[in-house]
Amino acid sequence: MAIILVRAASPGLSAADSISHQGTLQCSTLLKTKRPAARRWMPCSLLGLHPWEAGRPSPAVYSSLAVNPAGEAVVSSEQKVYDVVLKQAALLKRQLRTPVLDARPQDMDMPRNGLKEAYDRCGEICEEYAKTFYLGTMLMTEERRRAIWAIYVWCRRTDELVDGPNANYITPTALDRWEKRLEDLFTGRPYDMLDAALSDTISRFPIDIQPFRDMIEGMRSDLRKTRYNNFDELYMYCYYVAGTVGLMSVPVMGIATESKATTESVYSAALALGIANQLTNILRDVGEDARRGRIYLPQDELAQAGLSDEDIFKGVVTNRWRNFMKRQIKRARMFFEEAERGVTELSQASRWPVWASLLLYRQILDEIEANDYNNFTKRAYVGKGKKLLALPVAYGKSLLLPCSLRNGQT
């Protein structure tokens, strides 16, 4: 499921330190410190239904069909991403039939104590920047816990390329080099100790490179794009930068042996959590992004609400803005609802951190409402007290049977 990836600069944690604008690789600062069988599962927006609720039309808050300038129907972003989900699910099922979890990349030669140090450093970074999620990972088996740390760190380093302190120096060429480095670590040739942790993880779990490549593509998008014409475009961006994390994580989290859900439905729910988290980031950071000249809101929906870019830059909360935000929050919550069912299908030891992520991120939407939809000058956040209260709730939910069993699915 999706790891929390906050789209904001974090001082002292920059992957750009390892890819300079001249293109030379340098040492990273991080090193120093079920449904009935007859029904095919598809994303709720493609079915035109409220998440997990048959027979009831949803509000038009998802896009499922795009139209080109000639007026011809084209494949929507959701369908493109769903095709990726199907491929990832098929790959997982195929690789689990022929497990290679004890294999190591042929070219990788690193002492065992070196790998331990690499994983420990990943854990330190996760603890520093995602404390609640880190706490939840401590309930996982050691192998899964370390693997999730390694994935988290790679995602964070990638995110820092365009959001970190050196973001102004990052070019498309630098991202191409980062992708080449990704390909190297997937073939057992890591550049540094943090890469080595992920390379070892890849050798132990059936993880595919495609979601990692797609995340880098999202960073490329951030370099060239500051507006999104409609939700179809925004959905693809959210998939690239956050939905991919869910697809990376499912093979590590594992699916409960007693689950009756299809593999593709679990992947799709993981994707939904990533999308929900990113939409929440966007709604929380409207003012901050506007000050950087960026608007991550569907332009057509702004226009329909009688709003423009100028209204965003002025940052005045009006009734039009409140009504617009209510609709955006409703859509984000629908993705959270879609994600909830998939969390229950994960291996029990993996559920707590995912539930914690889901519950805490969803509360950010509540805080935006509590701030009277002022996300221009107020940054919604969940206080420490509410975080502490959410942890036992998340733990309790992690003990429940998979929804596919409770609902009698086969």
From Swiss-Prot:
Which PANTHER family would you find in this protein's record? BIFUNCTIONAL LYCOPENE CYCLASE/PHYTOENE SYNTHASE (PTHR31480)
GO MF term set: 15-cis-phytoene synthase activity; geranylgeranyl diphosphate synthase activity; squalene synthase [NAD(P)H] activity
Annotated keywords = Carotenoid biosynthesis, Chloroplast, Isoprene biosynthesis, Plastid, Transferase, Transit peptide
UniProt family annotation: Belongs to the phytoene/squalene synthase family.
Q: How does it assemble?
A: Monomer.
According to UniProt, this protein's pathway is: Carotenoid biosynthesis; phytoene biosynthesis; all-trans-phytoene from geranylgeranyl diphosphate: step 1/1
The protein's annotated catalytic reaction(s) are: 2 (2E,6E,10E)-geranylgeranyl diphosphate = 15-cis-phytoene + 2 diphosphate
> Is the keyword Plastid assigned to this protein?
yes
The record's subcellular location field reads:
Plastid, Chloroplast stroma
**Which InterPro entries does this one have?**
Isoprenoid_synthase_dom_sf, Squ/phyt_synthse, Squalene/phytoene_synthase_CS, Trans_IPPS_bact-type, Trans_IPPS_HH
Tell me which residues form the transit peptide. Answer: 1-62
Tell me one GO biological process term: carotenoid biosynthetic process
SUPFAM superfamilies this protein is in?
A: Terpenoid synthases (SSF48576)
One Pfam family this sequence matches: SQS_PSY
| Protein name, UniProt field | Phytoene synthase 1, chloroplastic
Give the organism the record lists. Zea mays (Maize)
**Where in the body, by tissue, does this protein show up?**
Expressed in embryos, endosperm and seedling leaves. Expressed in leaves and endosperm.
Q: What does this protein do?
A: Catalyzes the conversion of geranylgeranyl diphosphate to phytoene. Mediates the first committed step in carotenoid biosynthesis.
* EC supergroup of this enzyme: transferase
Domain of life the protein comes from: Eukaryota
- The EC number(s) given in the record are 2.5.1.32
Query: GO terms for CC?
Result: plastoglobule
